């Protein structure tokens, strides 16, 4: 499970973690050996690799087509991502999520390979010889999202107390994956507190940041003995109806 609550109801999301992958070390005594591992996984959990420092490949097949977004919640500490043998992305920092976009993917079964690297180097500002362990592996969840022509990349919602109640500062990023201009309708709502609708004009292959400050009235406030969470949900629509969404929690 990637989150303890549903983040999408329209967007098709498949978790690739919480399953068996193939792991192979790329150097050392056991180079080329293949081990079935349960991802998320750090190779230090494997008996032969408790002190292994180097690179290792994690492989998994997936079936998809069209616009596909691979989302990685964390890879320690540097990741190189390949699909069908071709490098499609990379990321440094074990503790931040990242994603890779695959546009117009051919229908069929594809091979995903994530090369994790826990070596110390000049490129690794944080991970230097020290008194804590720099783990190696896919340390957090992985998801595959199958997208339409546009999608919501994120929702940022910051509550602010005012003299009359609460405001919410919204920032919603919408991305156009098509090679033509696209007009969409963005609706953002929070559990009966407010609902707004905006028309968003997206240039070909570009993105737009929709920002708005909304009056949220006088909601229940989260406290230790009264832990109230609200669900904020954003939905994209076009002439054919709603086609993408993203939900999160708001204090």
Where are these regions (language model features)?
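Beta-strand-rich binding/interaction modules
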Residues: 68, 81-83, 166-202, 208-212
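Short, solvent-exposed loop/linker segments at the N-terminal edge
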Residues: 159-166
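Short glycine/proline/serine/threonine-rich loop/turn segments at secondary-structure transition edges
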Residues: 108, 123, 216-231
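N-terminal carbohydrate-binding accessory modules
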Residues: 7-8, 233-251
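Short, aromatic- and glycine-rich surface loops/edge beta-strands on solvent-exposed regions
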Residues: 111-114, 226-238
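Exposed aromatic-hydrophobic patches
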Residues: 97-103, 199, 207-216
């Amino acid at each position: 499970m990637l989150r303890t609550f549903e983040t999408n109801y329209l967007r098709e999301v498949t978790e690739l973690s919480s399953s068996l992958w193939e792991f192979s070390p790329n150097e050392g005594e056991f180079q080329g050996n293949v081990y079935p591992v349960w991802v998320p996984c750090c190779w230090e959990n494997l008996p032969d690799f408790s002190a292994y420092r180097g690179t290792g490949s994690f492989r998994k097949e997936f079936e998809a087509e069209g616009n596909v977004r691979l989302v990685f919640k964390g890879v320690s500490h540097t990741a190189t991502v390949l699909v069908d043998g071709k490098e499609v992305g990379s990321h440094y920092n074990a503790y931040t999520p990242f994603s890779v976009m695959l546009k117009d993917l051919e229908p069929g079964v594809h091979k995903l390979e994530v090369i994790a690297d826990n070596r110390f180097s000049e490129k690794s500002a944080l991970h230097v010889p020290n008194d804590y362990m720099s783990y190696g592996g896919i340390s957090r969840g992985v998801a595959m999202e199958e997208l339409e022509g546009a999608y919501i990349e994120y929702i940022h919602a910051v509550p602010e107390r005012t003299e009359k109640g609460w405001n919410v500062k919204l920032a919603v990023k919408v991305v156009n994956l098509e090679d033509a201009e696209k007009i969409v309708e963005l609706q953002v709502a929070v559990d009966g507190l407010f609902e707004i609708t905006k028309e968003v004009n997206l240039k070909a292959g570009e993105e737009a940041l929709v920002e708005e400050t909304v009056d949220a009235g006088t909601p229940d406030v989260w406290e230790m003995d009264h832990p109230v969470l609200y669900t904020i949900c954003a939905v994209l629509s076009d002439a054919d109806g709603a086609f993408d969404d993203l939900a999160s929690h708001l204090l």
